[in-house]
UniProtKB/Swiss-Prot annotation:
The protein, known as: Acetylcholine receptor subunit gamma
Biological source species: Gallus gallus
Record Pfam families: Neur_chan_LBD, Neur_chan_memb
GO biological process: acetylcholine receptor signaling pathway; chemical synaptic transmission; membrane depolarization; monoatomic ion transmembrane transport
Functional description taken from the UniProt entry: After binding acetylcholine, the AChR responds by an extensive change in conformation that affects all subunits and leads to opening of an ion-conducting channel across the plasma membrane.
CDD domains: LGIC_ECD_nAChR_G, LGIC_TM_nAChR
Disulfide bonds: 150-164
UniProt signal peptide: 1-22
Amino acid sequence: MRCSDLLLLFLLALCVLPGISCRNQEEKLLQDLMTNYNRHLRPALRGDQVIDVTLKLTLTNLISLNEREETLTTNVWIEMQWSDYRLRWDPDKYDDIQQLRVPSAMVWLPDIVLENNIDGTFEITLYTNVLVYPDGSIYWLPPAIYRSSCSIHVTYFPFDWQNCTMVFQSQTYSANEINLLLTVEEGQTIEWIFIDPEAFTENGEWAIKHRPARKIINSGRFTPDDIQYQQVIFYLIIQRKPLFYIINIIVPCVLISSMAVLVYFLPAKAGGQKCTVSINVLLAQTVFLFLIAQKVPETSQAVPLIGKYLTFLMVVTVVIVVNAVIVLNVSLRTPNTHSMSQRVRQVWLHLLPRYLGMHMPEEAPGPPQATRRRSSLGLMVKADEYMLWKARTELLFEKQKERDGLMKTVLEKIGRGLESNCAQDFCQSLEEASPEIRACVEACNHIANATREQNDFSSENEEWILVGRVIDRVCFFIMASLFVCGTIGIFLMAHFNQAPALPFPGDPKTYLPP
């Protein structure tokens, strides 16, 4: 048993000792590399040596673009590579160790920062370990969530596209000390933002059209005599997906605004109801305009396309309210206040209705006749007016109850003459009834004249109402045409506002992987 235990311990030692030896070699290698190593000094053999630093940006998520704050939020991986001659070793001396993981705080870093950040976070979010290789090359892949500034052009909102940039530069070193380069893989320069299909999460509001990358030296702020200034700029040209705004703002706004045009189908005299509907539509449009104002930046450089459309609809609605007031004013005119000229009658009652497809009532030929039947109550009212106009002495009757029954008295007197079967009695009865007959004739003439005047008054009233209807129909065609043409014209402007086919005008390169 003792021999077997010793054999087992020997075998375990053979399995464990290589791992211990390897781990000790990594520790020894790290200790040897960090001896007399100063992370604050640039890894250059000579003072004029320029250190090459390659960059590659991998986009994992386009989180959001806040138009109001003009902020682009992205989740990226920044791949950086450079060479440090102080971190070289011979793998044969350290059990063939081919790479070493070292905390990034222990080695020299090129201090690459995002220049156009908006929240003051210039540096990397998480300082991960760097990979060091025997030839002294260093590979660093830290993750970061950046909030960069992005100038928003709201002219065609919500059918717009934006060109956002992420500008990287060294915070400490100029182009005379380090050389920022784009990564080269398989002999090809990666002149674009790399997107890993497996790790990338597509944004629901924005579609990426172009993602080129460029290096810029000595931008307009510096002259060649100054210390060389270099940047690596990654561009994100993105197109908005407008479906959300079409469904939730544009379509409801168009439907509500079309109700303002439908008020022309109300009667011409219903001006109050027309104004009520139009003002309610105007209030709804104001609410939509307020919602848009909460979304876009507070800028006076341009007016959003949807803001222009809502303003256009508000102007149309206000014009409809003005039209309703004018039509109501015309429809309620009377001969006592306005007289219609022949030119107005010819244009608005004969000429325009033919072109507008309106059926106007035809005038009856011959002498004017009463077009409506009058009730007996109306005749009695006219008789009362006549009695008030005549002197009291001429309206004395035998009985007060017969004051409103002139014909009854006349017929009773004539009837007594007929009952006597005597011509002399009949003539005498006619002579007795003659004052009442004259009064009846005068009353009938007064009623006929008053009825004729009332018919003429009503006829001219109806003519003004017809003029109001014609004005209403003309305004309907104008406003409907303006509404349709304006809607189509404004949104056709959005249709032609597409992201460019190439990222840079005049440059035929697509800056995309082959």
